[in-house]
Amino acid sequence: MEHFDVAIIGLGPAGSALARKLAGKMQVIALDKKHQCGTEGFSKPCGGLLAPDAQRSFIRDGLTLPVDVIANPQIFSVKTVDVAASLTRNYQRSYININRHAFDLWMKSLIPASVEVYHDSLCRKIWREDDKWHVIFRADGWEQHISARYLVGADGANSMVRRHLYPDHQIRKYVAIQQWFAEKHPVPFYSCIFDNEITDCYSWSISKDGYFIFGGAYPMKDGQTRFTTLKEKMSAFQFQFGKAVKSEKCTVLFPSRWQDFVCGKDNAFLIGEAAGFISASSLEGISYALDSAEILRAVLLKQPEKSNAAYWRATRKLRLKLFGKIVKSRCLTAPALRKWIMRSGVAHIPQLKDYPTRFTSPTSRM
């Protein structure tokens, strides 16, 4: 049985960033259910927008995005829709439109060869024995058993590591549903949709590489029905759908209290969405995945005597920021307050009507 310093379960943005940062400094093994390349296998349903905080993480690490990760077009505003109030407003945003699956695979490709990575693998069992973490996983057609001093759960909303560490922990969950359609809108756009009759979270749309993606986060029990109902309502706001090219769904966490942020214990750590590090106001998680990976890197390399306590303290600022997102979410999902904010016109950028969308030469108008 092989022994490692660190075993990382999951190679989304959080796990990939941590594996890359620990490479050459600690002996690391990393397991991921995605394939190494291509579109086969698991891919995470996601609107695919890189927030400014995530962009800052790449600046800090000296990384630039390759062109095959960036999607077309780049959109500079979010069309915010209040369905019940029949209000639409445009707010400036500085997101980068990306292909999420290509982004995840690119993040994995940055992990140096010194890290032992198993793609298309399945973690079957974890337990703690003799001050070590033991992991049984299936990869390359057979089961393997390894041990590690530190275990890191970077395995997302349905984290096996979180369930093992906190079997009684309850956090609000939604089913995120997305459908892809051939783009029919004359002007591509990104939208954020609020309808309290459908969900107390929110829905979204994004134009991407010739497709129109429509999705949202809905109650687990009847999410599909609510999603379909909202699609029907959106025709009143000039949303155009047609026949779905692809449908996706996954579980998404929705932290609603301070106790929803859990960081680990007994030399096991949680990063990214597995720790509850996801914005309640936007469901954006990439920036917090990257930030928590950087925080844990610093803790593990120092190897303090009480590493879990050190990680808990080090994430306090991050957790406070995310708690602020919980407060913001409650404001955004309160119908009366949201209606008042949108009607006030604060930060709204009106779109000019009957204005040429392309520059034309003087002769072309003759």
Swiss-Prot record:
It comes from the Bacteria. The gene is cbrA. Belongs to the CbrA family. This is Protein CbrA. Gene3D superfamilies: FAD/NAD(P)-binding domain (3.50.50.60). GO terms for molecular function: FAD binding. It holds the Pfam family FAD_binding_3. NCBIfam families: PRK11445.1 (NF008519). InterPro entries: FAD-bd, FAD/NAD-bd_sf, Geranylgeranyl_reductase. SUPFAM superfamilies: FAD/NAD(P)-binding domain.
